[in-house]
């Protein structure tokens, strides 16, 4: 007798397996969804860039606004003349002892007319020298009057900007050298607290201390002040010459409303010693003398009492 065969329900088993797998998959998805926390929504907003003023600090080393070309707060790219701006941030990086040192990297400007001397800020702009009564140095848009030896000199630590405008400027500034002009912008009061004290020492017995304070005088920022000062002494490169300078610049601002402000600026400076202001010929410096020797780098051709003060 042949053995009987038992029927195997293959299709039923497959259906059961599919149903079980689907159920397990659904349970795992449900469990995963239950475990994962709900994601929070993050909203990102872009803050507007700080508005730069032609009389205030620049957001970066490269300034975008200037008042030298039009005497108004104007973007530099809209001024039809060539303008270069050296900001206070750039001066802090280079630590110049004079404005002409701060302008030593400015195109079209020659500052080494008297070697290492910092007695005056005499510049040659586009080949035109301006000194004495024809000097083209301005402070806050006003010409610094002088007569060569009593030319006014502003310390770079007191400035927010030093701006060079190249080319003829007599339409805006009257009598001037055709090469261009230098306009310096003083530091002005801020409503944000500013507290800075510096001590500096360097070669040639350089010692300098300075301070810069500014803040609002009331909660609304209607009244604000700024007080900047320094004291510096150093030996010049030449023997027997010394530099001494004391300066202070109090400033006060009144802002009755958002569109109106009155700023009082003052500057006091005393220089008991103005340093060396001479020059040496090519013979003996660049080229040797007939005996084959050269003058020492600290040679001073002037007399021991050939000094003067300025204030």
Task: Describe each PLM feature range.
Residues 1-38:
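Cleavable N-terminal targeting peptides that direct proteins into the secretory/outer-membrane pathway or into
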Residues 3, 39-193:
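Acidic, small-polar-rich N-terminal luminal/periplasmic segments of exported/outer-membrane proteins
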Residues 18, 22-24, 129, 203, ...:
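Short, flexible loop/turn elements at secondary-structure junctions
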Residues 74-77, 89, 152, 170-171, ...:
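Flexible, active-site-adjacent loop/turn segments at secondary-structure boundaries
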Residues 116, 152, 202-206, 241-245, ...:
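Transmembrane beta-barrel outer-membrane domains
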Residues 123-127, 238-239, 275-276:
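Short secondary-structure transition/capping segments
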Residues 146-148, 157-160, 171-248, 254-262:
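Outer-membrane beta-barrel translocator/receptor signature
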Residues 232-236, 248-255, 259-311:
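Acidic/polar loop-and-plug regions of large Gram-negative outer-membrane beta-barrel proteins
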């Amino acid at each position: 007798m042949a053995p009987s065969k038992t029927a195997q329900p293959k299709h039923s088993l497959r259906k059961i397996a599919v149903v079980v797998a689907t159920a397990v998959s659904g349970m795992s998805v449900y469990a995963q969804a239950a475990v994962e926390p709900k994601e929070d929504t993050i909203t990102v907003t872009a803050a507007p860039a700080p508005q730069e003023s032609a009389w205030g600090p620049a957001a970066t080393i490269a300034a975008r606004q200037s008042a030298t070309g039009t005497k108004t707060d104007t973007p530099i790219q809209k001024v039809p003349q060539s303008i270069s701006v050296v900001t206070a941030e750039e001066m802090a990086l280079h630590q110049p002892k004079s404005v002409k040192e701060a302008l030593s990297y400015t195109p079209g400007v020659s500052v080494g007319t008297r070697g290492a001397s910092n007695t005056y800020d005499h510049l040659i702009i586009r080949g035109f020298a301006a000194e004495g009564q024809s000097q083209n140095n301005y402070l806050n848009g006003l010409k610094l009057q002088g007569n060569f030896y009593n030319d006014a000199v502003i310390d770079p630590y007191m400035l927010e900007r030093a701006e060079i405008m190249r080319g003829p400027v007599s339409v805006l500034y009257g009598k001037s050298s055709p090469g261009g002009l230098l306009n310096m912008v003083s530091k002005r009061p801020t409503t944000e607290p500013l507290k800075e004290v510096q001590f500096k020492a360097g070669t040639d017995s350089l010692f300098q201390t300075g301070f810069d304070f500014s803040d609002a005088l009331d909660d609304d920022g209607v009244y604000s002040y700024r007080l900047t000062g320094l004291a510096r002494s150093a030996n010049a490169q030449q023997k027997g010459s010394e530099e001494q300078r004391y300066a202070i610049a109090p400033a006060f601002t009144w802002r009755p409303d958002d569109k109106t402000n009155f700023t009082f600026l003052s500057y006091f400076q005393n220089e008991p010693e103005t340093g060396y202001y001479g020059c040496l010929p090519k013979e003996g410096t660049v080229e040797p003398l007939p005996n084959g020797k050269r003058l020492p780098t600290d040679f001073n051709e002037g007399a021991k009492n050939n000094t003067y003060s300025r204030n």
